[in-house]
Amino acid sequence: MCSWCWGYRPTWQRLQEKLKTTVEIQYLLGGLAPDSDVPMPDEMQTFLQQTWHKISQQLGTEFNFDFWSRCRPRRSTYPACRAVIIARKYGKEQAMYLAIQQAYYLQAKNPSDLDTLADLAAAIGLDKTLFKEQLTSRDIEQKLMDEITAARNLPIRGFPSLVLETDDRQLPVALDYHHWQTSYDNTISHLQNKTSDLL
């Protein structure tokens, strides 16, 4: 549920394709906002709508602005994060990421709602009843807390972010929303520097 992550998706997909034989790609969830039933303040709704317009203008990203009139926006992203962790257990992490993004940004559905997430889980082939049980389990909550802690310890300032982890270092990777080559070149440079350090 990160607007800029949605905008970055096409470039990220191309970058992943180029890097898949060079590095192992791992996703970390940043958490952002704990569970809440409190309606999102009007100022924040306005700010996020402006952000969507900005991303659309700069990157050509599609957004369905009906979300803001059809749904009851809440600042609550932990449920979506837990949904991804559950899907990961069954090898469907990427499918869940995409399902949540499409529901939120294109279909005007609210991924803060547990019923929405359960429907998405069923749509990607997960057992809906079991998913709903796991979504509120202590085990999944702890895994999310551990992942948020790990993300906060990375050399990043926000999302999306890329980090190259080698044996002894975590190196931030330059991110370019328009050109995958920028991040690719920076990653290769980091790897080459690591090799040089060993010589």
Model-predicted regions and their roles:
Residues 4:
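Short, cysteine/histidine-rich loop/knuckle motifs that typically chelate Zn2+
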Residues 8-18, 23, 102-199:
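C-terminal cap of thioredoxin/glutaredoxin-like
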